[in-house]
Structure formats: C-alpha cells, structure tokens
Amino acid sequence: MATLQRSKQAPNVEEVAEVEAAFDRREKLIDGKVVSKTITDELKAKVEDMRADHDCVPGLAVVLVGERPDSAQYVRMKKEKVAEIGFHSVDLNLPDTISQEELIAEVKKLNADPMIHGILVQLPLPEGIDTNEVLKAIAVEKDADGFHALNVGNMWLSGGDPPLAVACTPAGCIELLQRYDITVSGKNCVVLGRSNIVGMPICALLQSMNGTVTCCHSRTKDTAEKVRVTGGG
C-alpha cells in the first residue's frame, strides 16, 4: 500500500527534467533510404521544372576505364538513379590499356560538350595513370564528384568561396545530419579514416559547421576510446 501511495505523489521536477534530458539525448535512427526517396522526388520535380521552363535537363557523363566489377556495379547504380530522376546521361567505357594522354583528351571533349553539365571519372584508375592529373583535367564547373583541386581547396578555406561540388559520400553524410536536425556546432566529432574521397572531406565539412573534429586512422592510438567519448560506442 505504501508503494501505491508513493506512486500517486507528484513527480519530482528535477527527476522529470533529468529523464526528459536523457530522452532527448537518445540515439536517433537515421534512415538513409527514406531521405534518399525524398531527395529523389525533389530532384525529379526540379528536372521537370527545368524541362518545362528551359527545354533542357542536366547532363551527366560517367567515364569508366577498365572492367573492374565493383566499379562497373557502382556505375550501373548511378545510371539507374540518373534515369529515374530524368537526367540526360552519357557513358564512356574505355579500355584499361588507354594512355593517360588519351584519357585526358576524352575528358576535354566532355568539357567542351554543351549537353554535359557534370563529369564523373570512376575511381580507381588503372596503374600507370596519374589520377590527380586526370581529375585536374575536368573543368571545375563540371566536376560532379568534387575532386578537382580548386573544389577541394575551397572546401578547406574558411570564409572563402564555397566549392562548386563536394564528394558524394561526405555530402550525403552532412545531408542526413541536416535532414534530421542534428546540430554539429560545439560537438565532438570522430571521423574514422582519412581518405581523400571520404574521411578528409567529412573532416573539413564538420569543421566548417563548428564541430570539434578528431580524425582517426591506421596510426591512431586508442581509437575505440575516442569513439566512446563522443557517445558512439
């Protein structure tokens, strides 16, 4: 009976506040598929507006060198999404025997094509081809992947011109945070990996959002502890 009487008492205000705060700090399940569907629908509508207002649609060229199964699958996924949204697309499949000079010449042809607004060179490229030289050959305004040196540099500059494009995986991570109203400013952020394609761009983007960023890599000590400090494990 004493227990029943206590349960009828008004709850302690401080205890309620503590419980509510803990509830607010709970992990959020981020559903990327739902966000992807939303973004796809938004892009479809924008493409239809472009078609109606300007009689044109965005054009994307994808350059695939060689026959790596993983690269081919990734390109197929991109083609399916491009077709779903309504883009104009061009696929350039080149043999892995192509020289660096020949590949750059093909990229420059796409630079000059007015129907192409974005160029994506699928990585990795075969041995013997300097990836940086090929990426620099892409016109910066057509750099769909955000790998051009000017776009990378602008991403790291504070207060400068924003990059015209950002690498897709880092951009997707930030988009998910924003769509779920997750604030980065003032928070400790741990990034696992320092690749030019994912890890380093995410570090730059999180820093630009005023996060305090720790980048862990193969030489980092106590990585698990650094992750636990952020509440991620």
Where are the model-predicted features located?
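Non-catalytic terminal and connector segments of soluble metabolic enzymes
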Residues: 2-5, 84-86, 109-112, 138-141, ...
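Glycine-rich loop at the start of a catalytic domain that most often binds anionic cofactors/ligands
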Residues: 72-79, 105-107, 132-133
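Anion-binding alpha/beta catalytic cores of soluble intermediary-metabolism enzymes, centered on
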Residues: 30, 118-188
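Positively charged, low-complexity intrinsically disordered leader regions
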Residues: 2-54
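Glycine-rich phosphate/diphosphate-binding loop of Rossmann-like nucleotide-binding domains
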Residues: 65-79, 161-233
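Short, well-structured alpha-helical segments in soluble
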Residues: 102-114
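Short beta-strand elements in bilobed, periplasmic/extracellular small-molecule ligand-binding domains
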Residues: 60, 82-96, 213-216
